[in-house]
Design a protein with these regions (language model features):
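Divalent metal-binding segments
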Residues: 1-109, 125, 129-191, 204-207, ...
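Histidine/acidic-residue-rich catalytic or RNA/ligand-binding cores of hydrolases
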Residues: 77-82, 192-200, 227, 246-253, ...
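Flexible, glycine/threonine-enriched loop-and-boundary segments that flank and lead into catalytic domains
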Residues: 107-112, 214-217, 222-223
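Non-cysteine beta-strand/loop elements that form the S-adenosyl-L-methionine
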Residues: 119-139, 233-244
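Short acidic/histidine-rich active-site segments
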Residues: 135, 180-190, 238, 269-288
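Glycine-enriched alpha-helix->loop->beta-strand junction motifs that scaffold or abut catalytic
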Residues: 200-202, 229-237, 272-274
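Short beta-alpha connecting loops at secondary-structure transitions
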Residues: 209-212, 217, 246-258, 277
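A post-motif C-terminal structural segment
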Residues: 254, 266-270
């Protein structure tokens, strides 16, 4: 139905898993390889969407949240959010960050059709860029190999990037030129290296900028990367619940004892007086 077969190449930033000793897909699509399936899924009606929003808003409000952040919106989602907030008195605010794609229109064109002003409690805050996948999914991009490689991979496997550095750098330059806030998904330390290198170039080109980009997840941020982050006004947002849900697996499977002991280095960020935030990435884990 999706047209994925033995001849279909891996897309940039994704992987089509294959059967052993064969090019025949085994049904598992990683990262950007999932996009073709997502486009084929049936879409709920506006009434169904609004009913879901009502439940989510009340659940989050009961937990004390007064602002919701959508970290990977698109134009259709944003129009839905605008309509929802215009249709009723929503007791929370929402900020959406639009996921931008490097191979489509220039960034200014992608952002031109939506205001960043607050409308009925909803606004577009900036853009979201994905640099890698997830460590527990073996798609986070690490500088050193995974402790135990996944099936079909050798001991050198480190995950892979969503974007090559030159494409990220192009997006960063456009964002800095137009003063557009940035959230950048970075689980693995190799992805964080690429982000830091790109931010150095952008800060050199636009030394008077006031942007404070955010490294989302920042699971494996190293000590040297914390130092660089402070100098570049990069704010890590740590997904600290990883320790509760996957701590033993990070230690025994994904990262090994040394790297797992340094996951989500909040204390080291504190020592440096580095501004950081924490999040739970709902619905990956519960918002409470």
């Amino acid at each position: 139905m999706a047209g994925i077969d033995a001849e279909t190449p891996d897309p940039e930033g994704g992987h089509i898993q294959r059967e052993p000793n064969s090019n025949r897909p085994n049904g598992v699509l990683e990262e950007t390889a999932m996009n073709v399936i997502g486009k084929m899924l049936p879409q709920p009606s506006p009434q169904q969407i609004f009913k879901t929003y009502d439940v989510v808003v009340q659940d989050l409000l009961a937990l004390g949240y007064t602002t919701i952040v959508e970290h990977a919106s698109d134009i259709a989602m944003e129009k839905g959010f605008e309509a929802y907030f215009a249709s009723r008195d929503v007791p929370v605010d929402m900020i959406a960050y639009r996921r931008v794609l490097p191979d489509t229109d220039p960034l200014a064109s992608q952002m031109a059709n939506m205001t960043r002003e607050d409308i009925n409690g909803f606004k577009l805050g900036g853009i979201k860029i994905l640099l890698d996948g997830s460590i527990q999914g073996y798609t986070g991009h690490l500088s050193q190999p995974y402790h135990v490689p996944p099936a079909g991979k050798d001991d050198s496997y480190r995950g892979y990037p969503h974007l090559p550095p030159e494409k990220l750098n192009n997006l960063l330059m456009q964002a800095y030129a137009d003063d557009i806030p940035l959230l950048v998904h970075t689980n693995g330390d190799a992805a964080i290296d690429v982000l830091l290198d790109g931010l150095e170039k952008a800060n050199t080109a636009y030394p008077d900028n006031s942007l404070r980009p955010v490294s989302i997840h920042a699971q494996t941020m190293r000590q040297d990367q914390l130092d660089r982050a402070k100098g570049l006004s990069l704010i890590p947002s740590f997904f600290v619940d990883h320790v509760y849900f996957w701590g033993d697996r990070h230690r025994d499977i994904f990262l090994g004892p040394d790297r797992a002991s340094q996951i989500s280095p909040v204390g080291s960020a504190d020592d440096r007086q580095l501004i950081y935030t924490i999040h739970d990435d709902a619905p990956v884990v519960s918002a409470d």
